[in-house]
């Protein structure tokens, strides 16, 4: 845009003679050419002004054919003025066209400036180019299109229109006498095609001109739509031009709606008249624009002079002229509004006889009846009617609640004052403000009084209401008075200064007033809702608060009564529901011991947890005998490694459980430890005793810290006697053992992670495998009902050999004929004789001391499973030839330990004692074949028995 203004001095060269020449050429070449040069000049002036006023750039952007079609469509509309100016410029610019193509570049500059410059510049250019009327014609068409393009560029603020309209110069150039200058090459721009002048032959130009006209018309339509929107948003000229369009022409919407039709008509015109279609269309546009622009010139006689004076800057005079028109229109509108308001104020019925309570209602009605306030009247109707309804509903005697009325009056005054702040409604607002107050005082003053008078009347009427309603409302009335003063000052300034105000100021005031009115209406709606409702809402709130307090107390008492009743059972319920106790305790012992040992804060809680874990492990062992046997084997192994004193210490503690342990014994053991066994001397099921004894064995290990050696010695003796009686009655026979030890089918191995493990490395891992679980279950079940214990050592060794034939397989793939058997049964016994004899003493001591229970417990499992890993020591129980002696000894040893261990001593007797000893002390199952003489074993057991008693005397200071 700076570039165009720099080219302004070239555009100043145009003279009115060129305008006259262009007009004469237009007359000769146009079908309807009957206009004189004098007629064209004012039309051209008005056209330039209308171009500045109107945002319809598409016509400027479009080709001359499109301009002509638009002018035909828009008869009596504001756009043809623009188009007429273009046509006049084209006729005037026809004289501008020089013979040399070098002059075309300054012509572009002059064209661009002609778009921005005033009429005398274009006239000077035309006078400069008076020679060559036909050349002038062609170049004036180009100039017109280019000028329109630059006008749209100026209006739009972008170069999009320049290329399109310059592209239309091609279509215009072939109409001229010089084809080289008329045609241009189009280069695509960001918003359209940019034209570059290229000499082209006439026929090719004619063909391309049609196509380019079509494309340019399409681009012009698009750019017109976009440009009109941009103008309305961006440029101040759009703000100046929009009111003129609406006021003088009122064709903004219609012209934009017809853009698509214009493009089609432009195409048709270009087809019919590729060369001369532009000229007659231009002349018709001139006539249309002259009619409309002459009317505009009558209202704005000084517009052309201001434009002529400002050659380089057209924005200022155009804005001033437009502002003058707008201000004059606003003045007329304000005068009309004032007259109308005066008539209405006089016609209003003056009802001052009614009470003051209803005066505000009358003011509301008067406010509602104002018709000129299109938006604001509707909003006021809604707000005031809503307020009146709330008043009537919430406060039937309105005098009882004076504050809401005063507030409504104040708000009505504020809303009216806010309405009066708008420029067009400035006079109306002041008169409207005076209306309700004068109605209260028998409107005798003129409604056209100054806003200061209105303020006085308002203050008087409000003071009267205040005397009736209360002094509190006076404070609130002062604020609306101040608002009225401010707004009235704005109204007076708007009335007086409308003539001198610029158009930008007018729009700013209008926008601000609209925003203020909208904000005031919204805020007042909220204020009315907040201020009219508070009396019922306050009363309701106080009532609800009182009722809430009373009801709340009642409800709280009722709830407390309801909850106090279940609170007594709730405490134990919550304790029972705790996951540990509910899952682990299955008896009513918790209810008996809530306060002492089973409470969460009791010191026995840790002991209880340990016992419950032990019981759970026992129950899991009962579910699968394989698991129980494996646990027994592991316990047996660990018991041998522990020192004797520790084992004895634990055995004694196992006989004296803590209070929760006693409860568990009552719970889970059929024979409680605290009661004598005389009533129950015999048992048919050894498994029950085994399971219960395993419980008793496993519990003291977990409760070792919590239990103390506080139990008397007599109880231990009772337990020993008890276990001896049970063991004597439950000794299995060798025949049953033979049936057990010869299974029909070896069960398949269930885990294969040990298949590459050597027999020496089995240790306790083979015990942990499930390969022999089925056999162990059968073995444990076979003990039920077995009573005889007479057997020979040969039978024991045979059964043991057959038993180990089955158990000797190191992997599932090993057969009964595998090498493992030969190694298992054929290795020399001499190696382990010394080991067994040397270790039986310690093993038996451990078995007597309390780990003996674990050792026997595990020796059974070894005989059942594999007898490979045998840390247990139960040989003295097995090696007695006389069953009575063995039963007595075993009963003395294991009566206080566990029923399971006591019952396991008898089946162990049927097996080879040397095998048990070997397997007990050797990790290699193959070495278990070596046997000890029975006499040696008997002597060893006797020695161990004596040594065990001595050690018990040393530890506990008592004799057995």
UniProtKB/Swiss-Prot annotation:
Subcellular location, record wording: Cell membrane
Protein keywords: Cell membrane, Membrane, Phosphoprotein
Membrane topology: Peripheral membrane protein
GO terms of biological process kind: eisosome assembly
Modification type Phosphoserine: residues: 48, 220, 235, 238, 319, 339, 352, 434, 461, 630, 758, 816, 818, 855
Modified residues (Phosphothreonine): 467, 675
Biased composition (Basic and acidic residues): 144-154, 285-296, 388-413, 455-484, 558-567, 746-760
GO cellular component: cell periphery; cytoplasm; eisosome; plasma membrane
Region (Disordered), start-end ranges: 30-185, 206-318, 363-607, 619-760, 812-960
Highest taxon of source: Eukaryota
Residue stretches of biased makeup (Low complexity): 298-312, 420-430, 587-602, 709-718, 839-848
Bias type Basic residues, positions: 947-960
Polar residues composition-biased segments: 33-53, 84-102, 115-135, 206-226, 236-258, 371-386, 431-453, 531-557, 619-628, 641-656, 686-708, 725-737, 823-836, 866-884, 909-927
Coiled coil: none
Membership in a protein family: Belongs to the SEG1 family.
Protein role: Important for the biogenesis of eisosomes, large cytoplasmic protein assemblies that localize to specialized domains on the plasma membrane to cluster specific proteins at sites of membrane invaginations. Required for efficient incorporation of the eisosome component PIL1 into eisosomes.
Assembly description: Component of eisosomes, large cytoplasmic protein assemblies that localize to specialized domains termed MCCs on the plasma membrane.
Protein name: Eisosome protein SEG1
Organism (species): Saccharomyces cerevisiae (strain ATCC 204508 / S288c)
């Amino acid at each position: 845009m700076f570039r165009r203004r720099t080219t302004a001095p070239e555009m100043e060269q145009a003279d009115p003679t060129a305008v006259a020449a262009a007009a004469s050429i237009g007359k000769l070449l146009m079908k309807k050419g009957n206009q004189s040069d004098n007629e064209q000049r004012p039309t051209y002036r008005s056209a330039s002004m209308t171009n500045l006023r109107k945002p319809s750039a598409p016509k400027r952007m479009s080709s001359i054919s499109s301009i002509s079609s638009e002018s035909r469509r828009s008869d009596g509309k504001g756009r043809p003025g623009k188009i007429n100016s273009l046509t006049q410029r084209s006729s005037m610019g026809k004289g501008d066209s020089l013979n040399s193509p070098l002059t075309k570049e300054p012509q572009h500059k002059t064209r661009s400036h002609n778009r921005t410059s005033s009429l005398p510049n274009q006239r000077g250019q035309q006078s400069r180019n008076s020679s060559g009327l036909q050349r002038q014609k062609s170049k004036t068409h180009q100039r017109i299109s280019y000028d329109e393009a630059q006008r749209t560029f100026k209006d739009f603020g972008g170069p999009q229109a320049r290329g399109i309209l310059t592209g239309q110069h091609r279509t215009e150039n072939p109409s001229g006498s010089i084809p080289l200058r008329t045609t241009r090459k189009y280069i695509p721009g960001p918003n359209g095609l940019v034209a570059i002048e290229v000499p082209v032959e006439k026929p090719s130009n004619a063909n391309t001109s049609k196509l380019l006209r079509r494309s340019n018309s399409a681009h012009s339509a698009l750019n017109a739509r976009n440009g009109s929107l941009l103008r309305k948003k961006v440029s101040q000229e759009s703000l100046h031009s929009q009111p003129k369009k609406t006021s003088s022409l009122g064709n903004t919407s219609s012209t934009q709606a017809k853009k698509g039709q214009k493009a089609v008509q432009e195409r048709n015109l270009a087809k019919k008249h590729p060369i001369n279609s532009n000229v007659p269309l231009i002349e018709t546009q001139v006539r249309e624009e002259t009619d409309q622009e002459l009317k505009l010139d009558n209202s704005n006689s000084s517009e052309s002079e201001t434009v002529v004076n400002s050659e380089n800057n057209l924005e200022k005079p155009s804005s001033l002229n437009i502002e003058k028109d707008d201000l004059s229109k606003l003045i007329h509108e304000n005068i009309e509004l004032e007259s109308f308001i005066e008539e209405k104020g006089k016609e209003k019925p003056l009802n001052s006889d009614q009470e003051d309570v209803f005066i505000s209602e009358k003011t509301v009605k008067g406010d509602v009846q104002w018709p000129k306030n299109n938006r604001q009247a509707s909003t006021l109707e809604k707000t005031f009617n809503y307020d009146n309804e709330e008043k009537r509903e919430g406060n039937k005697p309105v005098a009882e609640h004076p504050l809401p009325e005063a507030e409504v009056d104040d708000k009505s005054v504020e809303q009216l004052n806010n309405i009066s702040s708008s420029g067009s409604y400035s006079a109306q607002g002041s008169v409207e403000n005076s209306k309700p107050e004068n109605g209260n005082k028998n409107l005798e003053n003129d409604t056209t009084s100054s806003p200061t008078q209105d303020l006085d009347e308002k203050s008087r009427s409000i003071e009267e209401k205040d005397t009736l309603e209360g002094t509190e409302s006076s404070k609130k009335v002062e604020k609306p008075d101040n608002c009225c003063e401010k707004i009235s000052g704005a109204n007076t300034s708007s009335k007086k200064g409308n003539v001198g105000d610029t158009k930008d100021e007018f729009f700013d005031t209008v926008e601000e007033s609209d925003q203020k009115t909208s904000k005031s209406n919204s805020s007042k709606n909220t204020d009315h809702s907040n201020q009219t409702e508070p009396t019922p809402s306050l009363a309701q709130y106080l009532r609800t608060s009182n009722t809430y307090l009373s009801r709340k107390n009642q409800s709280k008492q009722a709830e407390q009564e309801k909850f106090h009743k279940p609170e007594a059972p709730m405490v134990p319920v919550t304790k029972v529901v705790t996951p540990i106790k509910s899952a682990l305790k299955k008896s009513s012992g918790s209810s008996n011991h809530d306060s002492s040992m089973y409470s969460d804060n009791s010191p026995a809680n840790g002991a209880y947890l340990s016992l419950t874990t032990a019981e759970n492990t026992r129950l899991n062992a009962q579910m699968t005998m394989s698991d129980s046997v494996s646990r027994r084997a592991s316990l047996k192994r660990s018991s041998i490694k522990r020192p004797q004193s520790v084992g004895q210490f634990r055995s004694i503690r196992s006989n004296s459980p803590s209070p929760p342990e006693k409860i568990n014994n009552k719970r889970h053991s059929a024979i409680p430890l605290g009661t004598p066994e005389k009533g129950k001397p015999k048992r048919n099921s050894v498994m029950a005793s085994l399971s219960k004894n395993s419980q008793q064995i496993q519990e003291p290990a977990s409760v070792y810290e919590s239990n103390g050696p506080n139990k008397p010695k007599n109880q231990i003796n009772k337990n020993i006697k008890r276990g001896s009686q049970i063991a004597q009655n439950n000794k299995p026979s060798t025949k049953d053992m033979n049936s057990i030890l010869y299974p029909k089918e070896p069960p398949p191995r269930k885990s294969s992670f040990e298949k590459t493990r050597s027999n020496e490395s089995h240790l306790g891992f083979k015990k942990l495998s499930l390969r022999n679980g089925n056999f162990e279950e059968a073995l444990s079940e076979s003990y039920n009902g077995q009573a005889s214990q007479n057997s020979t050592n040969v039978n024991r060794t045979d059964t043991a050999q057959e038993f180990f034939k089955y158990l000797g397989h190191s992997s599932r793939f090993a057969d009964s004929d595998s090498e493992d058997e030969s190694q298992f049964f054929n290795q020399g016994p001499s190696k382990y004789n010394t080991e067994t004899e040397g270790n039986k003493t310690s093993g038996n001591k451990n078995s007597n001391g309390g780990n003996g229970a674990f050792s026997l417990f595990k020796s059974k499992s070894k005989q059942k499973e594999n007898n490979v890993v045998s840390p247990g020591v139960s040989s003295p129980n097995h090696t007695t030839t006389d069953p009575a002696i063995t039963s007595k000894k075993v009963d003395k040893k294991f009566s206080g330990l566990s029923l399971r261990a006591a019952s396991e001593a008898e089946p162990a007797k049927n097996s080879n004692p040397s095998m048990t000893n070997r397997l007990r002390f050797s990790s290699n199952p193959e070495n278990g074949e070596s046997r000890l003489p029975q006499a040696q074993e008997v002597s060893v057991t006797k020695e161990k028995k004596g040594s065990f008693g001595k050690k018990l005397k040393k530890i506990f200071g008592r004799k057995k």
